[in-house]
Amino acid sequence: MMDAAAESVMSSVRERFPLLGRQVNGRPLVYLDSAATAQKPEAVIEAEVSYYRNSNANVHRGLHTLGDEATRLYEGCRDRVAGMLGVAADQVTIQR
C-alpha cells in the first residue's frame, strides 16, 4: 500500500498520460507492455500534432523550407536532450 504522498505523486504523473485515464473492467488502466510501445504524455502528443501540422518533412535531406524547419526542430531537440543529460549533442541518438 502506498502512503498518501506517493499516491499523490503517482496520480499527478498518471494525469499527464491521457490513455491512463481509461477504465478497463471497472479499474484504472495499467499499461505494462512498454517493450512494444510507450504511452505518451499530453505534452508529447501536442508537440507531435504541431509538428505534423506545421513542419512535417524529412530531416537532413530537403533543400526546401519545410526540410530546413524539420532539421532545425530535430537538431534543437537533440541539443535540449544533450543538455539535460550533460553530454555532447552528437552522443544523443533519436529513435523512432
Residue spans for each PLM region:
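Pyridoxal 5′-phosphate
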Residues: 1-96
